[in-house]
Amino acid sequence: MRFKIYTLALIPVILFQGYAVKKNTPRLAEPKGERIGQKGVGKSLSLLILGDSAAAGVGVNVQDDALLGSILKELSSEFSIQFYLQATTGFTTDQVIRSIQTLETQHFDVIITSVGVNDITKFTSPQAWIAKQKQLYQILKNKFSPQLTIASGIPPMDQFPALPNPLAWLFGQYAKAMNLELGQFVAQQN
């Protein structure tokens, strides 16, 4: 309820700031590099990474420097890793859910998700977002039977340099509330 009140009270400023941010903030490309493959030696491990621009690695030039590359560097001396990166800049939780419907049913040992920033920019309430997260995790469980699922939290959007206040503050409040909901959901899974 409070998010509706905050959002409604700030609508004139948010609309202006949102337009200015969208117009003036450069769009970074997703990094080049393999999104599907095998790397390393040792015990077999299958990895699926799902999400938005953070999962895709936006902000670096090559996948070797992104989340996927960092994980492969750390684990490839002990594991033969079959990896699959299914992440797209701008994706919301709904879009991630739709994208995994196109994947074959198979087993992944580990699944990492990173999604939520774009849900915030669409003003998805924390309650609606966590409901979508629960739906996502049920689909992941049923379709891929992972041994481990790792949920990345939403970054502190109030600290994004491209966002002016009060837009940064409002998005930061959404992020904090969503991370709290996500933490409670994850704690119930163990």
Residue ranges and their predicted role:
Residues 7, 14, 18, 73, ...:
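Charged/polar, solvent-exposed surface patches and flexible loops
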Residues 19, 90-92, 156:
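Residue-level detector of flexible, active-site-proximal loop/helix-junction positions
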Residues 1-48, 106:
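N-terminal secretory targeting modules
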Residues 39-40, 76, 142:
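Generic structural signal for beta-strand residues in well-ordered domains
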Residues 46-48, 54-131:
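Conserved SGNH/GDSL esterase-like catalytic core that processes O-acyl groups on lipids
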Residues 43, 79, 145:
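Residue-level signal for beta-strand positions within conserved beta-sheet cores that form or flank
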Residues 101-190:
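Alpha-helical cap/lid subdomain in secreted, periplasmic
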